């Protein structure tokens, strides 16, 4: 059952109605309402507006819930696909029985940059905000110095439009070492 379906069902129960009563009141087939509640059919604009009117909800509330649920589902699917691709290239060789839920966002971003291709990297920008990806890249990868230097130059130029990437990378690395020395 979808979240929207659960919400509609709770509104029906809390109001002391049954699906047949609501369907009759708003002029739709009970089976259509049942399919939406069960999550087997998407909520249409006219039906959403009728339900919102009947239950005195804000306009767009049900459609917003439906859209948010679809975005969440899409992002979970995308993350699972990226983890699957990483498993195919043996990026998690030291892990046993790993799933998408086990991988932190930081680790996923780092592994995708290191092990996967441009098309997969582009998917990161659908999953996460650009600033978050840049922060993870800067905190986890840039500080590794020469080990990932060429990759980091490409990432700096291609994804973050950094004009002088070599200088930028050296500066971030120096700042990181300075922090380590100051806190030692």
Predicted regions span which residues?
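Short alpha-helical DNA-recognition segment
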Residues: 17-35
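Residue-level detection of the helix-turn-helix DNA-binding "recognition helix"
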Residues: 13, 27, 38-40, 67
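A short, Lys/Arg-rich alpha-helix, primarily the initiator
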Residues: 1-17
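DNA major-groove recognition helix of helix-turn-helix/homeodomain DNA-binding modules
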Residues: 46-61
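Short amphipathic recognition helices of helix-turn-helix/homeodomain-type DNA-binding modules
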Residues: 61-78
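The alpha-helix within a helix-turn-helix
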Residues: 12, 23, 52
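Mid-protein regulatory/catalytic core that forms ligand/cofactor-binding pockets
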Residues: 96, 101-175
């Amino acid at each position: 059952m979808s979240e929207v379906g659960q919400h509609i069902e709770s509104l029906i129960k809390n109001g002391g109605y049954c699906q047949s009563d609501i369907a009759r009141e708003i002029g739709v087939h009970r089976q259509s309402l049942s399919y939406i509640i069960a999550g087997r059919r998407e909520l249409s604009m006219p039906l959403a507006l009728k339900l919102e009117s009947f239950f005195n909800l804000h306009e767009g509330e049900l459609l917003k819930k439906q859209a948010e649920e679809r975005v969440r589902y899409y992002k979970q699917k995308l993350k699972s696909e990226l983890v699957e691709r990483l498993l195919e290239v043996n990026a998690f060789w030291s892990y046993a029985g790993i799933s998408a839920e086990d991988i932190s966002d930081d680790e996923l971003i780092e592994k995708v940059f290191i092990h996967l291709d441009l098309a997969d990297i582009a998917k990161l920008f659908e999953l996460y905000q650009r600033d978050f990806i840049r922060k993870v890249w800067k905190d986890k990868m840039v500080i590794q110095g020469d080990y990932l230097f060429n990759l980091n130059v490409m990432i700096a130029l291609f994804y973050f439009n950094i004009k002088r990437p070599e200088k930028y990378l050296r500066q971030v690395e120096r700042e990181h070492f300075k922090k380590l020395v100051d806190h030692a």
